[in-house]
Structures are given as C-alpha cells and as structure tokens.
Amino acid sequence: MTRIAINGFGRIGRNVLRALLERDSDLDVVAVNDLTEPATLARLLAYDTTSGRLGRPVTVEGNVLVVDGRRITVTAEREPANLPWAELGVDIVLEATGRFTSAKAARAHLDAGAKKVLVSAPADGADITLAFGVNTDAYDPDLHTIVSNASCTTNALAPLAKVLDDLAGIEHGFMTTVHAYTQEQNLQDGPHRDPRRARAAAVNIVPTTTGAAKAIGLVLPNLDGKLSGDSIRVPVPVGSIVELNTTVARDVTRDEVLDAYRAAAQGPLAGVLEYSEDPLVSSDITGNPASSIFDSELTRVDGRHIKVVAWYDNEWGFSNRVIDTLQLLAAR
C-alpha cells in the first residue's frame, strides 16, 4: 500500500477521499492536515450538500478519523515543514489547501519526510504539470518529484484541445468556461481582490479570469501561446461547461470532428473523455467521473473554424483525476 497524506480537507480533499472509498485501490490515506477540528471534518465528510451523504460510518477517536474502518490521523499544523510525514511513513502528499501552490512552498512536504508531492492546482515551478490521460507519458519518476495536477478546467479543456489538434492542427483559439461558483468567491458582497468575485456568488453571473488556457501549454507544449480564455462564474454549486473556439490548419467537416471525438472517447482517452449525444444540462453531469463530457450536439464547424463544447463536474471529475495521478506516482 502507498501511504497518502492530504494537506487541506476542503472540497477537493474530501472528494478525493470519497472517491477513493469507491475504488479498489492500493492508496491508503493515513493522515489529513487541516486547521479545522476533527469533529467538524468528520461531519463535513459524512454530509455534503452537493454530493449527498457518504453512506459509510464516520467517527472520531481523539485525533483520529475513522472512516468505514480506516483510521486517519488528523493534525492541525500551519507549516508543512513541521508535519509528521516521516513519523507516519507518508509516501505522497496531496497538497490541497490552495495555499502552497508553488514548488518552493510544496517542497516543505519533502523536507517533512514525504517522497513526492501532488499539488491539486496549477503550481509555479512544478517539475511537471499533468492532465491525466492527455500527457501521462511525459511523467518521469526520476525527474518529477513535485507534480501539478493543473485545474479542473485545464483537465476538461486538455482532451478537447488534444483531439482537435491531432485532427487538424490548432493555429489559435479562445476558450470560455461557464463555471460553478466556488468557495473562493463571496457568499454576500464583500471585499475581494477581484471586484467581480467580490459580489454575491449565488445570485450573480460573474465574469472573471481563468488560467486554464495558459496552463494548456504546460500539458500540450505545441499549443503553448495559441489559446487564451476567460471564465464566467454562474449560480450553481457544481457542474461546469467549457467552450473551445479554434481556427485549425485545414478545412474539416462536422462528421470528421465528431468521429475524432467518438474514437478518442472509446480508445486512448476512455474514462477521461466521454462522448454524449444527449441534450445535457449541468445537473445531468453531476457525479460524472470523466474529465470532459463532449456534447456532440453543440459542435459547430465552418471550414477551418470549429467550436466544441464539453461539460465537467468541476469537483468529482477532477478528484478522480487526482486519484489516477496519485496511482501513477505510486506505481512509478
């Protein structure tokens, strides 16, 4: 078994543990570090507004979470370098606080005794950025110790971009994600570094920024600098959609585009990219573990100009890719 510690037991940290409980995996979560008291962490794991009840027993014994018989040590340490990873025999740390998102900051987990770190966000200076299934082959265990899993949107965009680039060569493009609100926004109007995100998340359409288009160049280097994009946050708690508008190097037909995505979803990107012919809305894809659910009905083609669209559960889909990436790091 590979011993995993989760630093930060928020939306992604809890969803990763939930998803792991549904898998037959050799990943063993042995520790959680979060500044919240264990009883509150247990309650938030057991009851979730978006995902529903866990359906497995969760109890607390002192500083230990007992989840369906699994014992998980809980610590509340602000500084990663002071965490007891050596003492607990931790192999890989999942850095999920959203705070230690640089290689320099994440390296503190190595100083504390972990062998590798997976950052569940874009990470400046990471040894490699992986969108599982898209550039997995680029991982080298001898070179890559601090790994970034990019973002939920990058993981949704990467399969869209790869298939289209392989088919006809993307020359340039623009992406827009219509994204569920997140905890980083305000529930009511209040101070925020982004004046739009300062406004009440549950009652506003909030135009803002995304780093997904820039990060795609880390996953698919031949697309570096070719894509740009924006984000629009909308009043739903989960379930997002990304639209990619591109100009490609040659004329293609709509059937060619659809055939390419269908083949990828059934072949090399199976489990990461899903192909749908149904008239979906966001609630239909809640709980879907794919990174990217291609909506074939929304495909538009005019010669070299192509628009493709994919849905994604920005929590559950991404959490499943985190697990896939942890398994990759554990195996190699």
From Swiss-Prot:
GO cellular component, one term: cytoplasm
Keyword Lipoprotein among record annotations: no
Keywords: Cytoplasm, Glycolysis, NAD, Nucleotide-binding, Oxidoreductase
InterPro entries the record matches: GlycerAld/Erythrose_P_DH, GlycerAld_3-P_DH_AS, GlycerAld_3-P_DH_cat, GlycerAld_3-P_DH_NAD(P)-bd, Glyceraldehyde-3-P_DH_1, NAD(P)-bd_dom_sf
Amino acids binding NAD(+): R11, I12, D34, R78, S120, N314
Biological-process GO terms, alphabetical: glucose metabolic process; glycolytic process
Reactions performed catalytically: D-glyceraldehyde 3-phosphate + phosphate + NAD(+) = (2R)-3-phospho-glyceroyl phosphate + NADH + H(+)
A GO molecular-function annotation: NAD binding
Biological pathway: Carbohydrate degradation; glycolysis; pyruvate from D-glyceraldehyde 3-phosphate: step 1/5
Domain of life: Bacteria
Residue stretches in coiled coil: none
Record site: Activates thiol group during catalysis: H179
Intracellular or extracellular location(s): Cytoplasm
Binding-site residues for D-glyceraldehyde 3-phosphate, renumbered to this chain: S151, C152, T153, T182, R197, T210, G211, R233
EC numbers for this chain: 1.2.1.12
Residue positions of the active site: C152
Protein family according to the UniProt entry: Belongs to the glyceraldehyde-3-phosphate dehydrogenase family.
Assembly: Homotetramer.
Record function comment: Catalyzes the oxidative phosphorylation of glyceraldehyde 3-phosphate (G3P) to 1,3-bisphosphoglycerate (BPG) using the cofactor NAD. The first reaction step involves the formation of a hemiacetal intermediate between G3P and a cysteine residue, and this hemiacetal intermediate is then oxidized to a thioester, with concomitant reduction of NAD to NADH. The reduced NADH is then exchanged with the second NAD, and the thioester is attacked by a nucleophilic inorganic phosphate to produce BPG.
Protein's UniProt name: Glyceraldehyde-3-phosphate dehydrogenase
Organism: Kitasatospora aureofaciens
Gene this protein is translated from: gap
